[in-house]
A protein has these predicted regions:
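N-terminal acidic leader/helix
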Residues: 1-23
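Short acidic, Pro/Gly- and aromatic-enriched capping/linker segments at domain boundaries
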Residues: 35-50
């Protein structure tokens, strides 16, 4: 499961999964963990993170 109460840890976990090529993109992660992508991005944006499609990671 993904850490839901710690936004830096959540961003780090997602970046780790993408970097280590466990998943090809954020949509695959959301599908696997049954997360709504828009809600996930909104929650992380409120904590100062934005998703870079080009870099395939939260920055």
């Amino acid at each position: 499961h993904l850490p839901q109460n710690d936004m830096p840890m959540l961003a780090s976990a997602i970046n780790f999964l993408l970097r280590d090529e466990e998943f090809d993109n954020l949509d695959q992660i959301c599908d696997y963990y049954h997360e709504d992508r828009a809600e996930l991005e909104k929650k992380l944006a409120e904590a100062g993170f934005s998703y870079s499609e080009e870099q395939k990671r939260f920055i």
